[in-house]
């Protein structure tokens, strides 16, 4: 831990990038930060100490109540922080200037906000709706400051909530749509600060019952706390949660994956690649990848995780190889391959990433895909096959096909399974995993089309009165009692058990725009916009059609607001949206490390994956 910390602290030189010409970061020419202003934890009394992973600085500040572009008094983190570079530009948060063919400006005119979209020489002026104006106010009020600089947004900022629990913390997964909204608005400092501060938290000690998880683990969330040093002096500290305080004490597997995805998005949108080229950032990427690619007992290229290790953070029967984790894992692998500098210390890791990408894409495309043809194939499966050429490789019993699926799946649609393990297929439709399979090209082009066809055909089930179902259908009766343990929060058609989550809008929008079907996203966004403002931006909605606000739903949920705004900005800026998704990588189909083509076996992942592209 100390070696990694020292490396990040002294790193001043950036390595060359892979797939691009040399590009070196520009560091501040000012005098170095005054680190004497910081205070070590050992100076605090035992009653004042927090967890050992806390980071300290001045002055006292937490949530910024107004627009955080306004000047504040006190010492800025730029003067002495080791994790945030000095000499950052003070961008106005009243204006956007996106460097692309489409230029979006947000100006104040007669106290009304107007959006100007310039495409070529044509200009179209569109006044922001009341919902958009309110959403920006809520998002900006949710910003958290640390040492005078914005570092994230709280999960929810409901003034009527007397017991916020951990909703007053900055969650990595929750901040992603907020970060994209700010980036698309031309405000990158908050995202840069967030990435660097969470990177420092990565290498700090985390322990549950005297056991420490992998070194590359990113926290699920962090909180800015203020501690008193004496009667007149206070100090701010970053207090991370790696799962030791979470319900069920589950490590956040998706946090590191989201961090890598956001790091790439920051570079793509801002054009500032110096951040990802820093030695400490390169080290952070390697730690996450090494943790994900570590050898184990698993026979599959998918990541093996426990229940509750992602957005669905309560017991919902997704332990094993859930699609959400696999699609984010695949995206993070592609991001890492793009951002890692190739040298003697990283070439083995890059080779391992390439091999894993090839194996993972084949595995998901071949075994997770479900359409009417595949269901009929499973329906006729023979079981107990013992052979390398077995058709039913996972020994799936046809009786596992749920009755609802037979009549539900459309003729022209399909989707990726929620989970796959020996003798087990989870036939539920999980939206986030399927959306990111489209965005990252984990699924084939024809599979991507079929997923959107299914959503269009089953609009009332997936969208209903509020987009979008987190999964479909709900676990009910004995399934709910056995699989969730009778969880009172995950009752049928509520919360993670097929509740409707508006934050998923931005991911649906990105998937639709990639496939050239933005009208689907616009239709869903129109459904949400009718209700979100009046309902005070709830976290989730209940009932089969999403008609009621969730029974335990927090109001003024930040990622609900951010998901709505990001969807609006993506639709208005298709050039920017194109920076956030991946096209099919045909080079991956030529990578095969298994050596099966030299044996008597009939199929290897390279040949089979190419068949998936050209035939399906």
From Swiss-Prot:
Q: Which residues carry this modification: Phosphoserine?
A: 92, 605
Q: Where does it localize?
A: Mitochondrion
Tell me what turns on expression of this protein.
Answer: By hydrogen peroxide (H(2)O(2)).
Transit pept. (range): 1-78
Q: A biological process (GO) annotation for this entry?
A: response to hydrogen peroxide
* EC nos: 3.2.1.26
How does activity track with pH? Optimum pH is 9.5.
User: What is the top EC class of this enzyme, as a single word?
Assistant: hydrolase
Which keywords label this protein? Carbohydrate metabolism, Glycosidase, Hydrolase, Mitochondrion, Phosphoprotein, Transit peptide
The reaction(s) annotated as catalysed by this protein in its Swiss-Prot or TrEMBL entry are: Hydrolysis of terminal non-reducing beta-D-fructofuranoside residues in beta-D-fructofuranosides
| Superkingdom field | Eukaryota
Q: Which body tissues produce this protein?
A: Expressed in seedlings, roots and flowers.
User: Pfam families under this entry?
Assistant: Glyco_hydro_100 (PF12899)
Is Mitochondrion there in the keyword field?
yes
Record function comment: Mitochondrial invertase that cleaves sucrose into glucose and fructose and is involved in the regulation of multiple tissue development and floral transition. May generate glucose as a substrate for mitochondria-associated hexokinase, contributing to mitochondrial reactive oxygen species homeostasis.
The identity of this protein, by name, is Alkaline/neutral invertase A, mitochondrial
Q: Which organism is it from?
A: Arabidopsis thaliana
Query: What does the organism's lineage look like at the top?
Result: Eukaryota, Viridiplantae, Streptophyta, Embryophyta, Tracheophyta
């Amino acid at each position: 831990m100390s070696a990694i910390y020292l490396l990040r602290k002294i790193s001043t030189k950036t390595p060359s990038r892979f797939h691009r010409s040399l590009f070196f970061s520009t560091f501040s020419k000012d005098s170095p930060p005054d680190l004497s202003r910081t205070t070590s934890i050992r100076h605090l009394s035992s009653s004042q100490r927090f967890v050992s992973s806390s980071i300290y600085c001045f002055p006292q500040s937490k949530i910024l109540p107004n627009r955080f572009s306004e000047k504040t008094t006190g010492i800025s983190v730029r003067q002495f922080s080791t994790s945030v570079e000095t000499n950052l530009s003070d961008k106005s948060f009243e204006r956007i200037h996106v460097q692309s063919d489409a230029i979006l400006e947000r100006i104040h005119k007669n106290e009304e906000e107007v959006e100007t979209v310039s495409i070529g020489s044509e200009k179209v002026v569109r006044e922001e709706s009341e919902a958009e104006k309110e959403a920006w106010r809520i998002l900006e009020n949710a910003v958290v400051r640390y040492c005078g600089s914005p570092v994230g947004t709280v999960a929810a900022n409901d003034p009527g909530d007397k017991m916020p629990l951990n909703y007053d913390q900055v969650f990595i997964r929750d901040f992603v749509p907020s970060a994209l909204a700010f980036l698309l608005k031309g405000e990158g400092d908050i995202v840069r600060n967030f990435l660097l501060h969470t990177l420092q938290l990565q290498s700090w000690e985390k322990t549950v019952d005297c056991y420490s998880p992998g070194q590359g683990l990113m926290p699920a969330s962090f909180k800015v706390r203020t501690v008193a040093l004496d009667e007149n002096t206070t100090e701010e500290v970053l207090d991370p949660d790696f799962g030791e305080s979470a319900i069920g004490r589950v490590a956040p597997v998706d946090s590191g994956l989201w961090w890598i995805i956001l790091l790439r998005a920051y570079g793509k949108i801002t054009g500032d690649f110096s951040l990802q080229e820093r030695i400490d950032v390169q080290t952070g990427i390697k730690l996450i990848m090494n943790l994900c690619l570590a050898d184990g007992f698993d026979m599959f290229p998918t990541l093996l995780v426990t229940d509750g290790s992602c957005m669905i953070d309560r017991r919902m029967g997704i332990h094993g190889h859930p699609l959400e984790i696999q699609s984010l894992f695949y995206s993070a692998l592609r991001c890492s391959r793009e951002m890692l500098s190739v040298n003697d210390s990283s070439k083995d890791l890059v080779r391992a990433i390439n091999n894993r990408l090839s194996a993972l894409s084949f595995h998901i495309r071949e075994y997770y895909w479900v359409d009417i043809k595949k269901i009929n194939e499973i329906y006729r499966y023979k079981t107990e096959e013992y052979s390398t050429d077995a058709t039913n490789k996972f020994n799936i019993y046809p009786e596992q096909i749920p009755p609802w699926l037979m009549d539900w799946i459309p003729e022209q649609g399909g989707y990726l399974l929620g989970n796959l393990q020996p003798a087990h297929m989870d036939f539920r439709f999980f939206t986030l995993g399927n959306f990111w399979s489209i965005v990252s090209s984990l699924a084939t082009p024809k599979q991507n089309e079929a997923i959107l066809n299914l959503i269009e055909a089953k609009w009332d089930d997936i969208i209903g009165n509020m987009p979008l179902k987190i999964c479909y259908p709900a676990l009910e009766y004995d399934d709910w009692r056995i699989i969730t343990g009778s969880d009172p929060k995950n009752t049928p058609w509520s919360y993670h058990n097929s509740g409707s989550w508006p934050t998923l809008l931005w991911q649906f929008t990105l998937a639709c725009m990639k496939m050239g079907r933005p009208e689907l996203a616009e239709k869903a966004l129109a459904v949400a916009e009718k209700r979100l403002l009046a309902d005070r931006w709830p976290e989730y909605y209940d009932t089969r059609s999403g008609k009621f606000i969730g029974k335990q739903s927090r109001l003024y949920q930040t990622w609900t607001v951010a998901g709505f705004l990001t969807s609006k900005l993506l639709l208005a800026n298709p050039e920017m949206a194109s920076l956030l998704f991946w096209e099919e990588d045909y080079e991956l189909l030529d990578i095969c490390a298994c050596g099966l083509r030299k044996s008597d076996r009939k199929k290897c992942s390279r040949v089979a994956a190419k068949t998936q592209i050209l035939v399906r």
